[in-house]
Amino acid sequence: MRNHEVTTTQPLLGPDGVLQEPGWSRRPLQLYRRADIKKRPTRIKEWDYYSVLSPSGDFGVCFTLSDDGYIGLQSVTFLDFKHAFEHTETILNAFPMGKLHMPTVSSGGSIRYCDKKLGMQFNLNFEQREIKCHFKNFYNGKPLRAQIFLEDPPQDSMVIATPWLEDPHAFYYNQKINCMRARGKVEFDGKIYTFDPATDYGALDWGRGVWTYDNTWYWGSGSGTVDGHRFGFNIGYGFGDTSAASENILFYDGVGHKLDDVTFLISDNYTDPWKFTSSDGRFEMDFVPIIDRAALLDVKLICSDQHQVFGRMSGTAVLDDGTKVVLKDFLCFAEKVHNKY
């Protein structure tokens, strides 16, 4: 099984702007510096994405703050799984190119965005992340407000450093943190939705890099409680040269259990059941969709075709020691995204 684990603290990029050590790690040992990148500022992409799901309350929210060079994308999603309802509002900004001052590390700093429609802030204090959001006209003239706290104790995460064969100065540096207990509330449409830290979790997708123009990727993530244990997973592929390592992993009580390849089996209709299978037999799942958060943007040189599907997963995952973890209707999401930008 491939999967080279990076274990040494070092600069992410060498003096030539090339990724020094492709592979994966349990925490961000490779140090990202925007100044080390040998590409135009319009090509640099930096983003923080949070998903917070409540299996007990049948709702969820997602938040994105990003600086993607010649375009910024700030986004909020509300999900009602009981009624299969979702709404997403996105604000696009032209040529941010570093103006958001995205932190160079995932373990510290704050990000703030404010305009006449949206105020959103991500804060990180000691072992706790805070999400604050006020979207004035989110849906049919109704605002959305949220204040959510995520516990972030020391635990394994999924960090990947991936190059592209066709461009030595392109790279994808990403950390996924799962299983962060959530508390707080969302106010929307006259209702208050409250997260219960006993059952509800958030996850972070922290990414920095320079991509090639045309990419399709697959990604899935889930966090929850199984038989009294914190359990989560991150699966995905399609992005860059993954010969050094996959980004497939299980999390069990804060410890990562690395997987090899996982394949998404998707029908043409994204709301039909999906299947997931693995080369090492350690992730075999059926997935029943609830909501397809579909989004299509096609504006000349910028094209994005997204299907982020939320649903419930059932099947078996196997830890490093052979322990089987059986999932039954485990709330999570999986996506297929094609981007040109």
Language model segments and positions:
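Structured soluble/peripheral alpha/beta segments that form catalytic or ligand/cofactor-binding pockets
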Residues: M1-Y341
